[in-house]
Amino acid sequence: GRYVTGGRGGNVYHVTSLADDGSEGTLRWALGKSGVKTIVFDVSGTIHLQSSLDISIGNVTIAGQTAPGDGICVADYPVSIKANNVIVRYMRFRLGNKNVLANGADGWDGFGGFDQQDLVIDHCSVSWSIDECLSVLGNKNTTVQWCLVAQSLVNSGHSKGAHAYGGNWGG
């Protein structure tokens, strides 16, 4: 992933709200904008997702290090990379088990991407998931660096019983 450009040279979108309703200023709104982009944060705190969040438009940098104070945490639903040329830096992901159990979706991973290329996940922490915390499989040119992937919820309602893993990655 050393040649990944993410949103370099594109538009800059500011996250000004911790809401997850897709309105202007939310992370969901910014991720839905087309074109090359960098997403910066003017707020800090936890974004409690109302549904799964897909990074489905590539050529994006999510710059969590721009958040003031204690930074940004994304919680309650999975975040999935479904595009190429994506950089995610200085973010926290906490799936938890509240919505997993309510939706009967014990295969959810906290964060990750499958079968993509040109990804960088840097200085992120991913924990409290009941399947895998971070899954990065079948990708090309992918770097996961300086990340903390830990504390899966082993006895938290998975259909296989005591089941949970920190990470799951490979080519």
Whereabouts are the PLM-identified features?
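Acidic Gly/Asp/Thr-rich repetitive segments characteristic of extracellular carbohydrate-active
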Residues: G1-I39
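Generic N-terminal helix/loop capping motif
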Residues: A30-K37, D42, Q65-G69, R94
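Intrinsically disordered, low-complexity segments enriched in small/polar residues
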Residues: V4-R8, S23, V43, S56, ...
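A common structural microfeature
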Residues: G10-V12, V36-I39, S44, N59, ...
